[in-house]
């Protein structure tokens, strides 16, 4: 604990010395151009500022959740249209092409360098994303993202959600329903307490991270394709379900499975249930979600691994009129994973078949208008020790085969404009891959991975 406390000033001083000139230059660029009004495609489509849908991107307001529920199709702008006739199809097409761009540049420094690499890494860019995001037709809209990764030096599909949405009445109450095509379990969700859009909303791709993680906690992201349906009744009860298959973008088709640790056999069903209530100054959601998948590692036939994840989550947003309508957000989740790794065990990749993982996280965030936000978060993972599944290795390994990791996250973001985010984030580890000291068997401590991360993000 003492090492974690001491690390912050030392890393921060070095980070500020290197990166401060970049942030000063960015601030001057913004300050000297007060007429700049670059906004994402949803803002251009609706004529509304970013703050209508977001407390702070990607955190959705109740209005933003309704916009997503309705299929991203609300618009106040001109369209090219043609009425439906007996022998002609209808047309509703945005005059403006719904394209947006996100540009991220960042700096990362860990308390101790990673062996064989420099410390204090600047990525310019860290990534660049293109979004086809907006209304396609009267009931069809999209959030479709491709991202350039500087380390891989290529573009690839990122989070994508294409949906059909409509509404009716059921038992005299509002009934929303829709169909979603997406490539990441929970990317279709409306709240920020599930993995795809949960805190931290951004982070370093340079710093080490804990080895163990639940399947639903990002392990299938952009590696699957799914089709599902969702409903919201009376603006309170939300139900959703999606079935997924492995896709492996960039790999040969038909899929041979080679080189992929997860190859879904049949389909992997994902389910979601949530209850929400919204008043003038309060928004509360409590819910559960989960997934079940069977997989043949590195093959499409043979012995199977089985994963069953279930989770509980909540989100509470409180608008405080006495503080000029500043917002305080509370979010949390718990994921339980039960595994039967028969295939991995058969190939000597695990010491025994049955394992479990528990993942917990919680955070509280204060939004100062739409200009500043500060977040404090805690996270932890623990489960079945297995020195074969979690072997010893420098930096990424575990000396005792224990998957337990615990830590905290501090994040401060400043938006000089609603489409520009300047952030500083600190990650501290109390335990990493099972131990506080010499966790990898090569002399590295958990606090050695404590990280300062600086981000400049531009959205236009």
List PLM regions with ranges:
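The canonical Cys-X-X-Cys-His
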Residues: 47-57
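Outer-membrane beta-barrel translocator domains and adjoining extracellular loop/strand segments
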Residues: 111-117, 154-159, 191-196, 250-260, ...
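Outer-membrane beta-barrel "beta-signal"
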Residues: 49, 420, 446-460
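N-terminal secretory signal peptides that target proteins for export/translocation
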Residues: 1-16
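Outer membrane beta-barrel
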Residues: 61-62, 94-110, 115-249, 265-270, ...
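Detector for outer-membrane/organellar transmembrane beta-barrel domains
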Residues: 281-414, 426
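C-terminal segment of classical bacterial N-terminal signal peptides
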Residues: 22, 26-35
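Transmembrane beta-barrel outer-membrane domains
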Residues: 94-96, 121-125, 153-157, 218-222, ...
């Amino acid at each position: 604990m003492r090492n974690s406390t001491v690390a912050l000033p030392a890393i921060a001083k070095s980070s500020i010395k290197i990166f401060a000139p970049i942030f000063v230059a960015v601030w001057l660029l913004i300050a000297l151009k007060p007429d700049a009004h670059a906004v994402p495609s949803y803002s251009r489509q609706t004529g509304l500022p970013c703050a209508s849908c977001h407390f702070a991107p990607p955190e959705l307001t109740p209005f933003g959740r309704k916009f997503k529920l309705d299929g991203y199709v609300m618009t106040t702008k001109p369209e090219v249209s043609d009425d439906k006739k007996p022998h002609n199809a209808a047309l509703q097409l945005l005059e403006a092409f719904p394209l947006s761009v996100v540009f991220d540049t960042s700096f990362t420094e860990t308390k101790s360098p990673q062996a064989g690499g420099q410390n204090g890494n600047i990525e310019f860019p860290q990534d660049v994303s293109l979004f086809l995001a907006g209304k396609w037709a009267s009931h069809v809209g999209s959030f479709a993202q491709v991202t350039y990764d500087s380390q891989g030096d290529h573009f690839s599909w990122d989070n994508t959600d294409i949906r059909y949405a409509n509404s009716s009445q059921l038992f005299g109450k509002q009934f929303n329903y829709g169909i979603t095509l997406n490539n990441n379990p929970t990317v279709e969700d409306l709240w920020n307490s599930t993995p795809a859009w949960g805190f931290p909303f951004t982070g370093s791709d340079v710093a080490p991270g804990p080895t163990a993680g639940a399947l639903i906690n990002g392990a299938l992201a952009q590696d699957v394709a799914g089709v599902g349906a969702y409903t919201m009744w009376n603006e309170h009860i939300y139900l959703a379900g999606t079935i997924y298959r492995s896709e492996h973008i960039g790999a040969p088709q038909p899929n041979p499975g080679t080189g992929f640790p997860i190859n879904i056999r049949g389909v992997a069903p994902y389910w979601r249930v949530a209850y929400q209530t919204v008043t003038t100054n309060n928004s509360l959601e409590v819910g559960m979600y989960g997934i079940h998948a069977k997989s043949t590692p590195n093959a499409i036939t043979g012995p199977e691994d089985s994963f069953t994840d279930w989770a509980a989550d909540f989100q509470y947003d409180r608008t405080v009129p006495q503080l000029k309508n500043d917002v305080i957000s509370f979010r949390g989740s718990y994921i339980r994973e039960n595994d039967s790794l028969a295939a991995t065990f058969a190939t000597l990749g695990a010491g025994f078949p049955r394992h479990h993982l528990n993942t917990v996280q919680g955070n509280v965030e204060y939004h100062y208008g739409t200009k500043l936000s500060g977040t404090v978060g805690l996270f932890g993972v623990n489960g079945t020790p297995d020195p074969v599944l979690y072997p010893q290795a420098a930096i990424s390994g575990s000396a005792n085969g224990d998957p337990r990791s615990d830590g905290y996250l501090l994040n401060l973001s400043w938006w000089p404009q609603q489409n520009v985010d300047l952030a500083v984030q600190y990650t501290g580890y109390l335990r990493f891959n099972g131990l506080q000291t010499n966790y990898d068997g090569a002399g590295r401590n958990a606090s050695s991975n404590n990280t300062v991360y600086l981000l400049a993000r531009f959205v236009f």
